[in-house]
């Protein structure tokens, strides 16, 4: 009921604004929240965390569609590339008990939140392998940036960017690895979610062998400025778009026939 009330247009703006000021003032902006049966460690100052707290969901259309395809196609691995606070990984572990999940998150603050959530959801510990590095086309440290708002460096939207943007961004270096070298998967059925804020092509180049040697459904966020490059690369590997959620730039590809 509260999540429905919070979605009313005027309250959708008013509630977060008031809550941010109060929680920051008393120093209680982070902690554990029960989100549809999952205990998640979240920070109200982070916009994605805040959406999960207020509405008990995030990218619900994408997650429900992805879960239905994993079940329908009997996929046995889920790769969460850009896992952030772990919402996708935890939801999929909750809904599909026998799936193997690899979660990759280079931002140390996001990794910290996800790790604390895993401690409170012990039943998923055998399903989820969480790594504190990102995927790319080379093994190296890369400079990342996060937007600072309300004095907090937001974990959602962290980008790989070698150039300094502004003083309103927090800069840090994070570890990245070539996905193919870490995973070494072949002849399996995979679901892959990639949400890496412009680093998509680098991730895909590092996963070329994995994408070639497995049946895959791929959910990838692609912004307009690099859509053509990413789409051309995936087309070259034999992947076709079969579903789109345009308002959030999320595209679903597969390299096998979707009925």
Where are these regions (language model features)?
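Phosphate/nucleotide-binding beta-alpha loop and adjacent structural elements of enzyme active sites
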Residues: 1-259
